Amino acid sequence: MFRSFLHYILRWLAKKILKKYKPDVIGITGSVGKTSGKEAIATVLESKFSVRKSSKNYNNEIGVPLTIIGVEKTAGKSVFGWIKIFGKALSLIFMRDKNYPEMLVLEMGADKPGDVQYLVEIAQCKVGVLTFISHAHTEFFKTIKKIAQEKRIIISHLLQDGCAVINFDNEMVMECAPTTKAEVMTYGFKEGAGLRATDVNFIKNDVGWPVGINFKVLYKGNVVPVYVQGVVSRSAIYASLAGLAVGLFFGVNLVEGSQALSKLRGLPGRMRLINGIKGTLIIDDTYNSSPEAAKSAIDTTAQIEINVGSKRFVVMGGMLELGSETENLHRELGFKIAELEIDYLITVGEAAKHIAHAAKEAGMDEHRIAIFPKAEVAGTFLQDKIKTGDLILVKGSQSMRMEIVVKEIMAEPL
């Protein structure tokens, strides 16, 4: 009862604030890449406008209104805390805050059917960004088709003077283009994308480890170089492209956007590079996991050059909320790992056992596969196993606590 009442009040307050201040709202959703996309979009827009973005992963029926109000921390179960938040919202409504942002970049999650519809009814988006549609939360949506239907609402609800920014490389995303009367801008790696990334390279330090990526962006005959520090993933490139596309719609040119992105840093737990003990390098991708994101992370790990004699480790925790597809989707990862130049596979948790079993079936040496029930044990095992020059990817769903593995083998606390 209290939660329903809270949702109602927050929704009412948020809509009143938006009606008064009329900021341009940029909404972003997708199975993967929401948070990194949000960060890139905000970084580009901040070069010309006052911008507020969703704090942390505030992407639901509580988090989105709190971002609109300008609160970075929920009150939890504190009635007094919520009264203070309501008071701040009412002061915004009945008084005028000269510093209210010109733009809001709102991450919109979809854990269950109806979530995106609820959020866009609170905040009508000027720009809708759809990053990717893949298997995630299938436990609640049952099929990927139903996931797609929910995610596409962020595009179909746009008004004619708005803009849909969509991933050209994802077929299910592109199917939403005909559902909107708004301008459509596409981005990706494939030929035909409006903003296209090419010539991707890892930037290396003096000892040969990657410290970031650079690439070129092609747009209407123009070519602009982009450099992003501290990450090595395709997801960072997709996020940068989305940021540039949104920037273009609001008048931030490619050069200005590229310069802004050079200030972007990798987010904790999202393909971030961390120095490990014994002169190793960790790819920390522990924030969360989904089948598509895991495949991309494994591909990236296999592509990074290491010295002769050094090893690549993949440490995988289980992926949650996959319903009846749990076993099959984990097994796909195991088959993929066995095909690539991955030297050791370490799994954590019950679901991840399917990864290990599939890798063994596909021909990976069983002596190079280790199965552990908890992250702490896997971390201790790794401490003894890794050597100078080794590369370690650590990934898993949030509840698997895979960040514990990273803490066990990182060179210095962050």
Q: What residue spans do the PLM features occupy?
A:
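Short glycine/serine/threonine-rich phosphate/pyrophosphate-binding segments
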Residues: 34-40, 61-63, 111-116, 237, ...
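Short beta->alpha linker loops
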Residues: 32, 59, 111, 133, ...
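Hydrophobic positions in the central parallel beta-sheet of the AAA+
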Residues: 104-106, 128, 164, 314, ...
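ATP-dependent carboxylate-amine ligase
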Residues: 1-13, 34, 47, 140, ...
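A conserved segment at the C-terminal end of the G1
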Residues: 28, 36-54
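ATP-dependent carboxylate-amine ligase catalytic core
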Residues: 11, 15-21, 46-149, 237
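Short hydrophobic/aromatic beta-strand immediately N-terminal to the Walker A/P-loop
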Residues: 25-27, 393
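Acidic, Mg2+-coordinating active-site environments of NTP-dependent enzymes
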Residues: 21-23, 100-101, 112, 120-121, ...
